[in-house]
Amino acid sequence: TLAAPEDRQAFDSMRLGYVETMGTPPLRAAIAGTYTGLAPEDVLAFAGAEEGIFCAMHALLDKDSHAVIVTPNYQSSETLPLSICATTGVALRERENWALDVDELHVALKPYTKLILINFPHNPTGKVIDRATFDAVVTLCRERGIYLFSDEVYRGLERRPELQLPQVAEVYERGLSLNVMSKAYGLP
């Protein structure tokens, strides 16, 4: 055998097979540990961002819904809601260093808006909104009972760690934080 005895023992005792639909309890506990105030029961593990976005959009939206998407955004975060319901894009202001205007978000809302999608640290600009803007988005969603889906896959890669925002799932009861292992953790 090519493996050292301790490696062979570890491999032979490894559990192989299908796992729980929501992710293994140890994995979910480890993920919950990266958040403040979340329990393993608050975590769903997916094979990747695409699957997470797909499931979230189909769980939260229907043909009678409306979603507001801060653009540009990850392609699936723009196209999946559009395949389900009416959407409105709110563009970041390029000439203002990719600023997000919360008043524009408010104007884009409809009585049947169920979801706002954001992406910070932003891909492709790298923009991180300031805490006051972030809090204003959370407040807007909370006041209207709107879900807030936050693509946070580049969290942890901020050039200035003091600008790191809280994870939406930590601060808002209807907040969904999407993260992956391939960016900040460098895993495939």
Predicted regions and their residues:
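Active-site pre-lysine segment of PLP-dependent enzymes
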Residues: 99-112, 124-147, 152-187
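Structural element of the ATP-grasp superfamily
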Residues: 30-32, 81, 168
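N-terminal small-domain helix-loop-helix segment of the aminotransferase-like
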Residues: 1-48, 55, 104
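PLP-dependent aminotransferase-like
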Residues: 59-118, 128-131
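Short acidic capping loops at alpha-helix termini that bridge into adjacent secondary structure
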Residues: 39-43, 63-66, 112, 173-174
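Conserved coil-to-alpha-helix start sites within the AMP-binding
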Residues: 49-53, 73-77, 185
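Structural detector of well-ordered beta-strand residues that form the stable sheet scaffold
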Residues: 44, 68, 88, 149, ...
